[in-house]
């Protein structure tokens, strides 16, 4: 199992916990609003909006909240904010590369919160381009196994452009080019296979192996960054062994 897959497992489990507590709702709502503003308010003609809505539904965001966000983004209802996407780069403990994607209506606030979280948790900000070259943009789909084998999933998505199917233990992760994400997701639907999320995500080309102490420090940094309302996603190239993940999750 590669480093990014292990980290995806950690993020996936954390996302489920956060959703149950309602912590993720605001970020999911922002994604819907921005997707509707960028590509129109019809999910049928806007794949990014469709995926944002599906992800929100999977996380139990109330339908009324989803619909209001869609309308705000599409201009059908007043109250939409002027969201801006900003990416910050840095290094965490043990030299782990960190990409931080923000969606904010206040650049100064976002920059300040990211900087504080980094410096208080063993991280350092880096110049643009000094970290991002270690990552590539990929389409990432996660789905629960539900009795499916890796071959079942691979057969459904291979011709649609899937590059890799990885077994994450309780779930599968499908990697594709971002441009093939909709085709792969549609192939799953055509095969009657349900999925949890479909996103364009950063995947590391080189990973940094961590021991238990290093993993604990990096996860503390990621938690601090994700506590900011302006931070949408945090990506690292940490490679955390399964046994250490199990210790940290106890």
From Swiss-Prot:
Annotated compartments: Cytoplasm
Keyword Transcription regulation: yes
Coiled coil: none
Gene Ontology biological-process entries: regulation of DNA-templated transcription
Classification via InterPro entries: Integrase-like_N (IPR017856), TACO1_YebC-like_2nd/3rd_dom (IPR048300), TACO1_YebC_N (IPR049083), Transcrip_reg_TACO1-like (IPR002876), Transcrip_reg_TACO1-like_dom3 (IPR026564), YebC-like (IPR029072)
Record-linked Pfam families: TACO1_YebC_N (PF20772), Transcrip_reg (PF01709)
Keywords, alphabetical: Cytoplasm, DNA-binding, Transcription, Transcription regulation
Gene Ontology terms, MF aspect: DNA binding
One GO term describing the cellular component: cytosol
HAMAP family according to UniProt: Transcrip_reg_TACO1
Family: Belongs to the TACO1 family.
Name recorded for this polypeptide: Probable transcriptional regulatory protein Mkms_2298
